[in-house]
Curated annotation (Swiss-Prot):
Keywords: 4Fe-4S, Cytoplasm, Iron, Iron-sulfur, Metal-binding, S-adenosyl-L-methionine, Transferase. InterPro entries: Aldolase_TIM, Elp3/MiaA/NifB-like_rSAM, LIAS_N, Lipoyl_synth, rSAM. Its EC number is 2.8.1.8. Belongs to the radical SAM superfamily. Lipoyl synthase family. GO terms for cellular component: cytoplasm. [4Fe-4S] cluster 2 binds at C92, C96, C99. This is Lipoyl synthase. The lineage of its organism: Bacteria, Pseudomonadati, Pseudomonadota, Gammaproteobacteria, Enterobacterales. Its main location: cytoplasm. It is found in: Cytoplasm. Coiled coil: none annotated. Its cofactor is [4Fe-4S] cluster. It comes from Buchnera aphidicola subsp. Schizaphis graminum (strain Sg). The keyword Transferase applies.
Length: 319
């Protein structure tokens, strides 16, 4: 290893901010470092509520993104009796290198899913629900009508606030907006995930500008509904790029923001390049609020649906 590479290695190891690196400078050699203390999760002693939620999901043939995506917040959220439901099956038609959700040929749509979802939400007695989905590029509408069917079924049985976290629908914005007109959510969420420079590596099946256009178009047509988006950090993005993405989101009508740390689900996924210190997350939140966001959740374990009700409820009440 030459002096330049050796110097970089020592800097990385000293700061202990990088978990795994796979770069040309290291000849694609994997270097593993311990996770910092702020990344470690405490498992609750009482797991009864967790088992109860999992049982309800299995009973009604439902999926949660909490389980499918190996979310680090599962113990906390399930213990509070909350879950983010994942519709349209458990197999994604894309294979993003950061995501733990299964991919491959998807199953046919479960027409009973909207009713099963509504019943489960009623049985759980929750007042705020987040619904997301796998990407279904095989469907003409990307699954938009199924989202609407779920929203309608839930509203028939429950007086709950509904947040949806949607895919990009392959850029078919005009069609999607028309479909959602018959069943609108309380919050519309679509994640840009990372900075545009890294899209080919991080989000190869997506287009940054199309994601912004989806968020902008939804807000223009349904101006009374808050729009939301999120970023995951630690993949090689620069501070200036993060700020620019936040400005892009805000200028396209987004008022709610989530920013979290990317955690590598397995050795087969894209490696973490940097663990973001807590102080940097605080600075990112400060910057987001100065840009104009109504609310910004920023921290290592923040995910799109993490404490979603706390973030959105004040804003929804104002509408």
């Amino acid at each position: 290893m030459n002096k330049k590479k050796d110097s970089l290695f020592k800097t990385i190891k000293k700061n202990n901010i990088i978990n795994v690196i796979t770069t040309e400078s290291f000849s694609k050699k994997i270097i593993k470092l311990n996770k910092p203390d702020w990344i470690k999760i405490k498992i609750p002693v009482d797991t009864f509520r967790i088992r109860e939620i999992k049982s309800a999901l299995r009973k009604n043939n439902l999926h949660s993104v909490c389980e499918e995506a190996n979310c680090p917040n599962l113990p906390e959220c399930f213990n509070r009796g909350t879950a983010t439901f994942m519709i349209l099956g458990s197999r994604c038609t894309r294979n993003c290198p950061f995501c733990a959700v299964s991919h491959g040929k998807p199953n046919s749509l479960n027409v009973e899913e909207p009713n099963n979802l509504a019943k489960t939400i009623f049985d759980m007695g929750i007042d705020y629900v987040v619904i997301t989905s796998v990407v279904r590029d095989d469907l003409y509408d990307g699954g938009a009508q199924h989202f609407v069917n779920c929203i309608k079924s839930i509203r028939k049985k429950n007086k709950v606030k509904i947040e949806i976290l949607v895919p990009d629908f392959r850029g078919r914005v005009e069609l999607i907006l028309k479909i959602f007109n018959s069943g609108l959510p309380d919050v519309f969420n679509h994640n840009v995930e990372n900075v545009p420079r890294l899209y080919k590596k991080v989000r190869p099946g997506a287009d940054y500008k199309k994601s912004l256009f989806l968020l902008e178009s939804f807000k223009k047509k349904y101006s009374n509904i808050p729009t939301k988006s999120g970023l995951m950090l630690g993949l090689g993005e620069k501070d200036t790029e993060i700020i620019q993405v936040m400005k892009d989101l805000y200028s396209n009508g987004v008022t709610l923001l989530t920013v979290g740390q990317y955690l590598q689900p397995s050795i087969n996924h894209i490696p973490v390049q940097r663990y973001i210190p807590l102080s940097e997350f605080k600075n990112i939140k400060k910057e987001a609020l100065s840009i104009g966001f109504t609310n910004a959740f920023c921290g290592p374990f923040v995910r799109s649906s993490y404490h979603a009700s706390f973030q959105a409820n004040k804003l929804i009440k104002k509408i």
